[in-house]
Amino acid sequence: MMENFKHTTVLLDEAVNGLNIRPDGIYIDGTFGRGGHSRLILSQLGEEGRLLAIDRDPQAIAVAQAINDPRFSIIHGPFSALADYVAERELTGKIDGILLDLGVSSPQLDDAERGFSFMRDGPLDMRMDPTRGQSAAEWLQTAEEADIAWVLKTFGEERFAKRIARAIVERNREQPMTRTKELAEVVAAATPVKDKFKHPATRTFQAVRIWVNSELEEIEQALKSSLSVLAPGGRLSIISFHSLEDRIVKRFMREQSRGPQVPAGLPMTEAQLKKLGGRELRALGKLMPGEKEVAENPRARSSVLRIAERTNA
């Protein structure tokens, strides 16, 4: 039975407003979660509008299946495959907006059985979709020390990555870790300098979660796919929660807004320049939560919303 964990959608109005909803438009909510964004989008669509939602979390799918609306459909899978889902429905190049709310959701963090949080003892899992792939425990038990250190450094920006990786491997040799509390304790013991404002396991849990779920690769693939999926004038509205996510989104929007870069002085005909194509996107800026939203929902503090529009290129 699924527990009813509360989820407050971050930047709800801002993200949906960023899509510039047309009543008869076709939209994608690539991260359904508990449906906050989807329900608001549906409330702004007319009878001819359509919303395709995606999530790889079976609990999110269960929530979505309770929505009885002919304009709405839900897909169980990763949002990185959105181009395939759209092609199957013969909607390539016809999507008017894509919304992505990246990272882990509050219900996932708050449910100890999902294994995402060092604050709650539960199985060391961390998979967005517990039916597929390796759990965090399985990966940590089989990975090389150097690989664990690389993941902690790359995806957690953990300065004690090597020391923590060594402690994890040594502990797993003695007795394999299967609980979140065990990993949190090992990391805390291996961290020589503590941050008084942050639990020592924060960066390790983030890094392992990102690795287990291939989160950054998912984002990069979805962004790349969006260019073929969106109609001219279609919008991208993307919420990030940490610098690694935001860096990818920011770089993508900046590069696609600039268009092909031709070295100064390179002799090219007008036909050759035209063949290179123009700007794929027009960046429309970023928004961050206000003081009121952060006070009501502290998890919103680090969020950044970036919006871009597909050009006619």
Curated annotation (Swiss-Prot):
Its EC number is 2.1.1.199. Pfam families: Methyltransf_5. It is found in: Cytoplasm. One of its GO terms (molecular function) is rRNA (cytosine-N4-)-methyltransferase activity. Transmembrane segments: none annotated. It catalyses: cytidine(1402) in 16S rRNA + S-adenosyl-L-methionine = N(4)-methylcytidine(1402) in 16S rRNA + S-adenosyl-L-homocysteine + H(+). It is an enzyme of class 2 (transferase). The keyword ATP-binding does not apply. InterPro entries: RsmH, SAM-dep_MeTrfase_MraW_recog, SAM-dependent_MTases_sf. Keywords: Cytoplasm, Methyltransferase, rRNA processing, S-adenosyl-L-methionine, Transferase. GO terms for biological process: rRNA base methylation. S-adenosyl-L-methionine binds at G35, G36, H37, D55, F79, D101, Q108. HAMAP family: 16SrRNA_methyltr_H. Belongs to the methyltransferase superfamily. RsmH family. Specifically methylates the N4 position of cytidine in position 1402 (C1402) of 16S rRNA. This is Ribosomal RNA small subunit methyltransferase H. The lineage of its organism: Bacteria, Pseudomonadati, Pseudomonadota, Gammaproteobacteria, Enterobacterales.
